[in-house]
């Protein structure tokens, strides 16, 4: 049974909260929060353990003074992966940790998204959360443990937050005993391999009323979910498909564990007893400014918001904001330290009024700022084969969002090598997402990817990965690049669609096409009743104005990836399930549009490498490689093919054309899958060695024969072998004899014979 216990050591000042997670048939996991021993000078420091082996130190620290000139909350989250956590020395040149891995950056985002909304609005002091991975069981995932540790450190720091955040990873594990699947919290890597779907859920406790009774409930704040890599095959074998209902079930299954983790953190904070600190708050505007702006703009602004084109609408609303600012500034300027401060508040109030108008119109009239209905998708445009020499390319447009997808294929040895604490050391399918500033008509820095780009790329990668063919079916490394050329709502889901198109154009035999859609949710009180309106294919403005946004990607039959963030204290199950079904309808519409252009793999580009496989006995691997790589290097040089050998004896041959590949296959088979040559067969061989009694001639890699000196003179006596043939010389020979030890005797023959 899941439970929370507390321990205090007054002598050493240690306080512990231990949460036991009961997974039924799959045993229990223990999450232990400990404070008082490490990092005592941080405002809050908690060491978090998953069972006994995985250990993370989370610290939260705030600056003494607010940052001047900031109109946002300066929160920074950093995750430090220490290689000593896994008993390893970093593989970099300097043998120390460098910039964070992709996994660490994704963990930072996973922590930031649910924790940021818990801080009081108007806080401008710099807050830094640092999570250091100190010990790591290779069977565990640390990212969700880090959410809980970061929340606990923040909760005891005295900073103004609304409460603790609990995070849990749930895996739907399917095995012989559980053919319909069981949800397992904090799954191991082995259980991950058995699962068909995983979901990370973060939430907090809120007070609710039912009649006269008050009770605590879990409000979901963030969801990250994805299907497993082998989900298609598992579903064919009878496992449940990860449908919209499975997602809803996973959310409900996660709530009891989030409740336990939040209670453990709250109990720890009560026992630590740190007093709440006072921080100056900087609200974006005063009630007086808001009221003045609202009286001025409501009617005209509502009219301007009905302009359908984004640029026209933005230009009109911005021009009107400047007009209102000029009109109200003389009235409020004297109340502020500078005209700039007054101007900033008027603009903030204007944006808040605009948000309120849009939300009200959505709830009462199902109005959208571009004129669509709540379930309508913007105009779609699909094209493939845009980039001349790319192996595969596509252009996917949805309204003003425009994504270019480009696919590159290469040898398996080009897969990404991963030097991080995450399970697995290589990645064959890589998805890279670029978001240049011109995509929104702005200027800015270009170069190395920012955290947002890495996060969007990871989401698109997770969406497509379940339909990527296996290494055996398609022995290529695959790099997919998404270029966001225009942005007005969900470039990440546009990237999923562009990827399917581009991969098909490159000839990749996907198990099924995948599409994605971004959804929004707006809620509010209308005539005393809470109304919810789900929006399909949200614009950038609707994303900012809504209470929840979620992105859903999948095939026609099941979900492959989902990401959800909400500001609400809870979403009724019926509302969420209806929104997921609405997203499915949109996904099917997009898939049909894509299928009209390309509905299966094209023929591979002439510029793509041709990769074939040959299986050789494991015992022959060394012979194929040869001493110091002699044989493999000779094969590469002679045929022009690239050759990669796996530990199981699978040989991958990559060549620019079919003839080179066939030549390499023939030579590999001759060496490692040899058919014994027969007496009378002729070869054009190469003299590899001369001795006093004859010349050794290479017939095939690793297969030599001897031409005796007596056979070299065409019937005449030869004093020295080197007088007739020299090393490196080509010579036409015929097999005269093969003795019982397999030694080959050769005789030279004239080419015309």
UniProtKB/Swiss-Prot annotation:
GO molecular function ontology, one term from the record: RNA binding
Protein localization: Cytoplasm
GO BP field: mRNA catabolic process; RNA processing
GO cellular-component term (any): cytosol
Catalytic activity: RNA(n+1) + phosphate = RNA(n) + a ribonucleoside 5'-diphosphate
Sequence positions that bind Mg(2+): 543, 549
Signal peptide, first to last residue: none
Cofactor names: Mg(2+)
Pfam family, one: PNPase
S1 motif domain residues: 680-749
EC primary class: transferase
Function: Involved in mRNA degradation. Catalyzes the phosphorolysis of single-stranded polyribonucleotides processively in the 3'- to 5'-direction.
Stated family: Belongs to the polyribonucleotide nucleotidyltransferase family.
Protein's name in the database: Polyribonucleotide nucleotidyltransferase
Species annotation: Corynebacterium glutamicum (strain R)
